[in-house]
Each structure stands twice: as C-alpha cells, then as structure tokens.
C-alpha cells in the first residue's frame, strides 16, 4: 500500500513485549487491579473452594471434545484439581467454529467459555450491547496472574466503558512474529524434477514454479496447484502482494483513518488481479473455496497439491501437522529435504510486505449466563493457567517424568512428546485456552519440537525483521466503537473468492464491490470513526 506511513520491522522487533509470562522458565510478575466492583465474585470463589465442590464449566474451543475425553489425563486432572473446576466440552472445529458460536449467541446456547477471533468484528460490540457476553469482574486482585495479563494493550483497547469483555490469548512476543501466521509450503523436490533449479525470489517466479510442477506432474498424480489448510488463509498470501494488511486500520494519503483494505483502490485492484491470474492459471486450486483441514493436509501429503497456505504458528507447526506423517510415508527426514517455505516476495513498490494481525490472536469470552460462582471458577482457571505452575503443567508436562529442573531451568526429557502422550494435548487447542505455546517464537522456551523445525520459524521471522516492511497501523481506531462502525460489515475473504473466481473483468468487479460498500454507508462510517478518533486524541503518526 503506497499511501500509509511505514516503520522498519527491525525497529519494532526491538520492542518485544516484556509482559509475557515465562511459564516453564520462571515465575511471573504479580500485581493487583483495584476498582469499585463488588466482592460477589471473590466471595463465591471462597465459598466454592471451602465446599471443595468442582464447578462444571462448559467450554468451546477447537477440538475440546477430544482434549477433554479422558478424565484421568494427568494434565487435565492437575488443572481441575488446582482450580476446582470440571471442564465440559461443547465441541467446535476449525471448519465450523465461527458459525456455531454466532448461532449459539443468537439462540442462547453459548457455553460458559468460548474462544475465537471476534474482537475486531462488528458483532463483538453487538454482543456487549445485547448482553450476550459478561465482563470480567472489576476487581481482579484475588487473581493476580489474570490481572497482570489483562493489562495487555489489546485487552485494554478492546474494553467498553471501563469493562473488559475478552481475554487475549497471547501468541507472540511482538507483532513481527505474526508473519508466522501465514506461510506457504511447497514441494521443492517436484519443482526440481520439473526443471526448476532456483528457489523463487518473486511472486512471478513462484507462480512459474507451480505451473511447471503441474505441467510436468513428475509423480503422475494429476497434481494441482496451491491449496489452503483452513478456510480464509489464502488472503494472507494475496493481499501482501499489494501492500494491504487487511486486518488493520491505517492512515491514507489524506490523513484519514481507514481499513487498509479500503485505503487505495488501485492496490486492491492489483491484489485481486493477482489472485484472478493465479486462479485462472491453476496456481491456485479450483476448489480452494472448499478447503478443509484434514482434506488439504491429505492432498498435500499424497502429492496431489503442489503447495499449501497454512498457519500453525509458523513452519515449526508442520512437524506435528504433516511432517511426521510425511516421513512415515517417504522416509525419515524426507519432509525437510523435499519441502521448502516460500520467502517474502517484493510487491510492485519493491517492499516485502507480510501478513500482519496481532501478538494475541483470538480471545476467550464468557457467556452472560455465567453466575458469580462460575465466574469465580473461571477466574481461578485463568489465573492458574497464567501462573508459572500452570504454564509448566500445560506446556511442559509432569516434573520428573516429562522434564527436570536444572539450575532453575526446565529441561525436557529426551523422547518426550506431550501431544502423543496426553489426550489433553493431542489434536486440539483446549490446552491453549489462555495463551498459545511460546515455543513457536521463543527459542529459549522448553519444547519437544525438533530443533530443525524450530529453526524454520526463526528463519521466517528473521526474513520479516530484516527484509520485511511493516506499515504503520492504528489499533486504537480498529477497536473504536461507534454505531455505524459496529454495524458495518465487510469480509475480505469472501470478496477475494468472489472476484478471484468471477468471470467479469477484475477492475469492474472491484469498482462494483466498492460501490456496494459505499451504498452500505462506508463513507459515513469512516467519518464517524474518524470523528471519534479525533475526540479521543488519536493522531496520525
């Protein structure tokens, strides 16, 4: 995007957040938040603990039914015994979670706790206004670890009228690590068989490589182009090609705050044309809109897709998601030998942009139907999960069995694979309710991921810091609540798929789309949001 001001990624990386709790490495800082809230919740907490009766807490997070299926799982038992809760799954998957949660919010069937990427969407404000979700207690002094966590800028920025309605799930140390949230893995072995001798350095070279693989079809499997591991990932490859950071608000050339998506019409045309060309040429698979996790993984594993867009907190996540299965099929060490991660490629202006979202992707929410007793139990749960003891249990396992403490540091035992050993950790995210495992970005954090895979994450992040361009963005505006802003809905993924797969000229479709948004009140919404930003003293940097 040509109009937004930019700051070097290297400078931002130096500002890595120091408030992340150290989990397996040491003790977290504690502090109190003192306000004028009543003590009903803390009283309920004391009463429940005195009675020693576990409080049933229903929870919806990806794969919860599997993660909570063994009541005797040592990690799960440790959490429940330490907090006085009994976790009950209300299952969602990566394919259906948002639809299910929005439906439950409408029909009153929300679980006590649910997770998702909702804070920047219009219905977050609606949930607050309609009383769908409950705010955390004003006084969190009884829960010092939770209180410390809620000082996070993202949590405070998303508050309403002094109330905190969501708990950020910490992902990374700073925003530059969000490059790990959109990655492309491709079959370098097949590219070489197709006559490619150099790994691609540009978008054009990448597309030429995929087309060469498809044309040669070296393994005779009628291989197709690039798929995505989950719905809505493909934009993370497309939009940076035009400098668009579609999750953020920026300042346009007129000094007006706008979603990056709407900041420059020509940039949007460029991005959509790039997507259309890839789709037409077969670089992007024809059934990309139907992509589902297990299907996409299997197609890539079987050599039926030449490339795949994925998240998984970076390439290190490939080991558990597909690398081990690949090695089982094709021989030990074959995945790292046969596959490569796409580098950052330059846009038309020469800058190498990348997907930018947040250092805390997704949030945990509490249903308004939760009473004081349950709220106290939920606060105890999160307070424990943010404690040193809780993080060690969730991410390091059982002391003496899975890890030892040597000179004050946790050292994982050789051969330990928590995801294979514990049902609580296998193929689900229930263990990441409070935060994502720091092992994906913090190289000093104890981990059972192979060093070779962790190094892939380090290399990708280094590419972003040294070579990437991070436009200046304004989360203070992103989280503003105004009537028109809360009601205005746009979906960059749906727009992308519609135009990419469309038959009319891209430029016409983009103009028609923008006209449609204008008819829905885009300009009025922007004027209202900018007026509110001015009232709050938010200025263009």
Regions found by a protein language model. Name each.
Residues 11-12, 20-541:
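Extracytoplasmic/secretory soluble proteins
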Residues 1-11:
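Bacterial Sec-dependent N-terminal signal peptides
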């Amino acid at each position: 995007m040509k109009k937004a001001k930019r700051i070097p990624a290297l400078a931002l990386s130096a500002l890595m957040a120091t408030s992340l709790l150290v989990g397996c490495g040491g003790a977290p800082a504690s502090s109190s938040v003192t306000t004028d809230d009543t003590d009903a919740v803390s009283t309920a907490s004391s009463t429940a603990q005195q009675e020693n009766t576990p409080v049933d807490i229903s929870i919806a997070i990806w794969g919860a039914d599997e993660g909570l299926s063994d009541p005797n799982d040592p990690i799960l038992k440790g959490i429940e015994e330490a907090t006085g809760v009994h976790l009950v799954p209300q299952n969602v998957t990566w394919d259906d979670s948002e639809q299910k949660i929005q439906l439950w919010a409408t029909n009153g069937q929300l679980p006590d706790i649910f997770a998702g990427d909702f804070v920047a969407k219009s219905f977050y404000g609606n949930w607050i206004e309609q009383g769908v979700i409950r705010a955390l207690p004003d006084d969190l002094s009884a829960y010092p670890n939770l209180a410390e966590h809620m000082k996070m800028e993202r949590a405070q920025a998303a508050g309403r009228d002094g109330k905190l309605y969501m708990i950020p799930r910490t992902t990374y140390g700073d925003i530059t690590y969000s490059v790990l949230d959109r990655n492309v893995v491709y079959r370098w072995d097949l590219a070489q068989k197709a006559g490619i001798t150099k790994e691609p350095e540009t978008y054009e070279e990448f597309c030429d490589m995929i087309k060469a693989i498809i044309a040669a079809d070296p393994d005779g499997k009628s291989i197709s182009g690039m798929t995505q591991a989950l719905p809505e990932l493909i934009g993370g490859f497309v939009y940076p090609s035009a400098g668009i950071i579609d999750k953020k608000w920026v300042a346009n050339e007129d000094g007006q705050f706008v979603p990056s998506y709407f900041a420059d019409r020509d940039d949007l045309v460029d991005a959509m044309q790039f997507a259309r060309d890839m789709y037409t040429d077969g670089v992007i698979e024809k059934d990309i809109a139907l992509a589902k996790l297990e299907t996409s993984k299997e197609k890539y594993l079987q050599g039926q897709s030449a490339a795949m867009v994925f998240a998984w907190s970076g390439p290190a996540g490939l080991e558990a998601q597909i690398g081990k299965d690949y090695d089982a099929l094709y021989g030990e060490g074959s995945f790292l030998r046969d596959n490569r991660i796409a580098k950052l490629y330059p846009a038309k202006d020469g800058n190498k942009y990348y997907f930018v979202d947040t250092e805390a992707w997704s949030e945990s929410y509490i249903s308004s139907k939760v009473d004081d007793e349950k709220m106290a139990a939920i606060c105890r749960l999160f307070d424990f999960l943010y404690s040193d003891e809780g993080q060690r249990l969730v991410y390091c396992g059982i002391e003496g069995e899975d890890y030892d403490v040597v000179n004050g540091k946790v050292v994982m035992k050789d051969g330990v694979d928590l995801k294979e050993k514990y049902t609580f950790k296998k193929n689900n995210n229930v263990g990441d309710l409070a935060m994502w495992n720091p092992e994906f970005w913090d190289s000093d954090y104890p981990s059972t991921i192979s060093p070779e895979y962790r190094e892939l994450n380090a290399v990708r992040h280094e590419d972003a810091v040294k070579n990437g361009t991070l436009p200046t963005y304004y989360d203070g505006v992103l989280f503003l609540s105004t009537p028109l802003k809360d009601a205005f809905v746009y979906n960059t993924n749906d727009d992308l798929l519609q135009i990419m797969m469309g038959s009319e000229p891209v430029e016409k479709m983009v103009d028609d789309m923008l006209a449609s948004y204008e008819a829905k009140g885009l300009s009025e919404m922007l004027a209202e949001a900018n007026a509110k930003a001015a009232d709050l003293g938010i200025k263009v940097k």
